[in-house]
């Protein structure tokens, strides 16, 4: 890679000491939301479009989402209830699992034939509507959606190109989950709370349970998130500027983070990628026999994924499923929270008033009692209260979300989740960690591969 990139060379030369005043800081205390940008303060918000009105005649809407079976069922039940209450509105759903979903929706956004109401990933606002051309500014629909039910910081994270392009359905972050049934078999009775605990668990698993048992498995993208978590814990600065995606770390610091992940592999803490892929291919961890039977006894996953992983365990291991603690690898609280998903209205929608009414119903109104925590703990205050009153908030998800939100303090930039970086099998993160595991390379050996890939998607490195 060329050494002419000024920001990268600057950080190399200063060792980040002279640059400290220029870098975003995190870790000193938890933040209510750590994906918020300053965008919302750049221009006044659009006012409600007073010309919007609900139709008395028949209206057809379409909606799309991704997820698992339980989410599909919740959405469909909520849509049935909505249509019963609004007898002139028919809602046609389109839904599937995540695999291949972004590619399908990207094509639809480009072609201008996406559904009227879309469940969106936060970074889609930047990837597909950075100029505000794909999604309606929901400030114009505020006659029909009570936008005051969301915290300003969470709303700001969805404010792109001077437009409130979606409302946040939920906020999420990563946390450890452990199968204490297996940990107990290894003679460990408490969840890991430090790096020393992790390394001791790796040794105990290998010695007492055998080479086939591991405290944890992390795929390539999971490893990248944990690496960033580790670096933020140690250095107290965001991985990158949350608005400009200017990287805040030197090559040496990143190589250190990569070596941290390698030390977990070498210490039998996490299963080597060749071992996992040899048995499961690209299959999801919760669907692997190793997870189901307790041979993999831990993960580092989104707080909203708790139920999925617990439900996948066999009857022997299910009782041991435990929400762990965030691990402080340094002097700071590392890790980020982000908008888990949002709800947007496409600009091709012919009935934005009805579309906004549907969003209001699902996330602020009676539909929230049906949706519960299927899309995470609701970010809407009214939606959360409604779901709680209905007893529809999963206790594990709520516990995990509470631990995440009270700990993490760093900000996420919009390029971190670029599909060119995180795609399973083909992304740069995959290439980097495959090279470490398959070829036994050090962090210093692969840091340029990571930085080149980040630069290619728009990072200033």
Give the label of every model feature segment.
Residues 41-53, 122-173, 322-329, 395:
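Hinge/lid segment of periplasmic solute-binding proteins
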Residues 73, 81, 134-135, 304-311, ...:
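Mature extracytoplasmic/periplasmic domains
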Residues 80, 84-85, 90-92, 162, ...:
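Extracytoplasmic/periplasmic substrate-recognition and gating elements
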Residues 81-150, 159, 181-193, 289-298, ...:
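Extracytoplasmic "Venus flytrap"/periplasmic binding protein-like
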Residues 108, 115-116, 145-182, 214-215, ...:
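A structural signal for short loop-to-beta-strand junctions that line the ligand-binding cleft
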Residues 161, 165-169, 174, 199-247, ...:
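Extracytoplasmic/periplasmic solute-binding protein
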